[in-house]
């Protein structure tokens, strides 16, 4: 399997984990030194991401659809860029919402495994 294919497989696994509410599977996508920057929010670590996503999974039925525009690999570093659509439905009733976001992720390969080390996203207008 090429590095490009391995990264695409990791992205597909991320979406499967997110869509099934599998927090452990979702967190496996990220490097332990993760720094995540989201629009309008402070940067967060992997532990902070875990707390936030745990709360989201508890409160909402979730779905993510990812469209990769670009995957580029250079040695043990890579980046991906694309668009994802998150759909959330409150578990206690309420209106389903969709949010379209553009993302950029920086990947690091360690011990043969690709993980996201840095990620940022913003709302598409």
Placement of each model-derived feature along the sequence:
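Short beta-strand edge/turn micro-motifs at domain boundaries
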Residues: 100-125
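Amphipathic alpha-helical repeat scaffolds
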Residues: 12-15
